[in-house]
Curated annotation (Swiss-Prot):
GO terms for molecular function: dihydrofolate reductase activity. The gene is folM. Catalyzes the reduction of dihydromonapterin to tetrahydromonapterin. Also has lower activity with dihydrofolate. InterPro entries: NAD(P)-bd_dom_sf, Sc_DH/Rdtase_CS, SDR_fam. Disulfide bonds: none annotated. It is an enzyme of class 1 (oxidoreductase). SUPFAM superfamilies: NAD(P)-binding Rossmann-fold domains. It holds the Pfam family adh_short_C2. This is Dihydromonapterin reductase. The active site is at Y152 (proton acceptor). GO terms for biological process: one-carbon metabolic process. Belongs to the short-chain dehydrogenases/reductases (SDR) family. FolM subfamily. The keyword Nucleotidyltransferase does not apply.
Amino acid sequence: MGKTQPLPILITGGGRRIGLALAWHFINQKQPVIVSYRTHYPAIDGLINAGAQCIQADFSTNDGVMAFADEVLKTTHGLRAILHNASAWIAEKPGAPLADVLACMMQIHVNTPYLLNHALERLLRGHGHAASDIIHFTDYVVERGSDKHVAYAASKAALDNMTRSFARKLAPEVKVNSIAPSLILFNEHDDAEYRQQALNKSLMKTAPGEKEVIDLVDYLLTSCFVTGRSFPLDGGRHLR
């Protein structure tokens, strides 16, 4: 008899940076992947050519979230994991409509994972004890707060709390954890002065790159016991 095909891992926001690195990591392991993307970056074509199922999604509305969930339900009978990586980062700038800033942050970081976890729950269940995972990507600012990104920090804190609620709801079939990164990698346009200032905020004084996230995700996926926990990736920044 042939080997059973693994269930796919769903990655939201998989078209660039950490989401893209995770998608390629799993593809290289012959692990099927479903990726959501908002903007069609050239990297999406590479994922499609490698066999990934890429679905364009608009998470700015609940209707858009549910339309994406419907597409996933049509695509697969089960999921190995959901990695909630889709994110936005908006500051409270002078003149910015504050209610809109808060609504946007809550929509992408709270409404979207909340609705998807419920809509796709049946795809995660039925595969055995601790056989499925949900991983929320939160942020270092969940514990510290942020004076320049108040709505962002609040929405990520809500997602962090939701990790524990879904862990209680879905155990023991599904493990639910969160990863709280600070600086992982720089943007191409970041200048040398900014990079040095950012590096000095942590004890380790380095931007570790995507592999640090990938290694932690692999650990969480292979664990049969860890659930309802948040895992900081901050290089000791909390001790500065």
